[in-house]
Each structure stands twice: as C-alpha cells, then as structure tokens.
Amino acid sequence: MRVALAQMLILDPKIMLMDEPFSALDIQTRQLMENELLQLWEADKKSVLFITHDLEEAISLSDRVIVLAAGPGTHPIGEFIIDLPRPRDVAEIRMTPRFLQLHEQIWSAMKEEVLKGYQQTKNKLVV
C-alpha cells in the first residue's frame, strides 16, 4: 500500500482518487496508513476523493462525507460536514464525543440503505 501511495504521489496529481485503499489491511496497519495519509494531506492539502464502506474511516479521514443510496441507480442521500479538529490521530479521534455524535448522525441517515442493500443481496442468494 505504501508503494502504491508513493507511486501516485510521484505523479503529483491535483486530485487523489482512493477507492477502498486500506480494505485488505489488518486494523493496526490500517490505522497507521490512515494516519500517514492524514500527514501527507496536511503537507500538501491536495483534494482526495476517498471511497469507503467503513463509516469510522470516512469520518476519521474526511472534511465532508457523502452517503450514497444502495443499488445500481445510486444517488446522494446525505451530506455531512466533518468538523473534527486537525491534525487528527485516527485511533484517538474515534473516542471523542463529537466523533460519536457524527457517527450516530450519519448512521441514522444510511441505516435504511444498508438494510436495503443487504436485503437485495440476500434475495439474490435465495433465488
């Protein structure tokens, strides 16, 4: 993962697209890489489009979270400003009252879509 990140940074893109970059990592390595990404962002302040299914990761790394609807005809169903202070440490920020408040707020908006997606998958397996 570090090599892929370094290769992307060599190209000096204006926008970094990161689609589930840490999903295959164990939780400890994931948190180290998330903190490394935050440090890189602090240095250059480049725009990052980060795609993840991990709500905690989205809140920890973002300034804004956009929740999409489940299914092939996806569309935004919610937008949330993440007003957590920077610099951030992902392990520490997740224990703060504001983080927990944001988590609850976003989860409330997306819970129905998660259940809908789960039901769609479940129905495909039964048929």
Model-identified regions with their sequence ranges:
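ABC ATPase nucleotide-binding domain signature region
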Residues: 1-3, 30
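Conserved signature/switch motifs of ABC ATPase nucleotide-binding domains
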Residues: 7, 11
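Catalytic Walker B motif of ABC-type/P-loop ATPase nucleotide-binding domains
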Residues: 16-19
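Short coil-to-helix N-cap segments within the nucleotide-binding domains
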Residues: 24-25, 29
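Helical segment within the ABC ATPase nucleotide-binding domain
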Residues: 30-44
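Conserved H-loop
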Residues: 45-51
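Conserved catalytic segment of ABC-fold P-loop ATPases
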Residues: 61-67
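Conserved beta-strand-loop-alpha-helix hinge in the C-terminal portion
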Residues: 70-101
